[in-house]
């Protein structure tokens, strides 16, 4: 990353992330969502009771009518997101990575992928990063499962700059 990129991440929307201070991937997502919400009136954020860990507070404060917590019900999260996408909304569905892939795999495959619906699924805490929560919260096979779905694109950004660019797209 160049020095200019290291200090500031600036997208076409004037989205700025200060990279001189350590910015986590989750914080980058939260900041980007708050900015993108002003550009896309049909953007909705749905969570499976991971509002705080997903850092969506800024979006939730700016657009409380476009943020929904379905509770610890990942299967429901995916089916609701599919229904909203079918009606013209652009849902972003947040859950812990192992639950965004394994717990609701049938709903993702059947409701979202078969219908080619534009649902963005964001699984946070991939790999061993949620290890303190126990082995059930470690996602080691999530990417392998999701790439097996037809009409699914799996992206794994490596840093906050890549996250911002992916969300802008």
Predicted regions mapped to residue ranges:
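Thiamine diphosphate
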Residues: 2-169
């Amino acid at each position: 990353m160049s020095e200019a990129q290291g200090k500031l991440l600036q997208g076409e929307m004037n989205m700025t992330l200060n990279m001189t201070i350590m910015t986590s991937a989750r914080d980058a997502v939260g900041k980007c969502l708050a900015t993108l919400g002003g550009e896309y009136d049909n953007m909705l954020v749905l969570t499976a009771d991971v509002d705080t860990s997903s850092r969506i507070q800024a979006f939730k404060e700016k657009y409380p009518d476009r943020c929904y917590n379905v509770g610890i019900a990942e299967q429901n999260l995916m089916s609701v997101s599919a229904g909203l996408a079918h009606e013209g909304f652009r849902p972003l569905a947040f859950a812990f990575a192992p639950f965004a892939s394994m717990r609701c795999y049938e709903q993702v495959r059947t409701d979202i992928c078969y219908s080619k619906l534009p649902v963005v699924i964001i699984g946070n805490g991939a790999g061993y990063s949620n290890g303190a929560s126990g082995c059930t919260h470690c996602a080691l096979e999530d990417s392998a499962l999701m790439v097996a779905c037809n009409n699914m694109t799996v992206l794994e950004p490596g840093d906050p700059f890549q996250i911002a660019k992916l969300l802008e797209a």
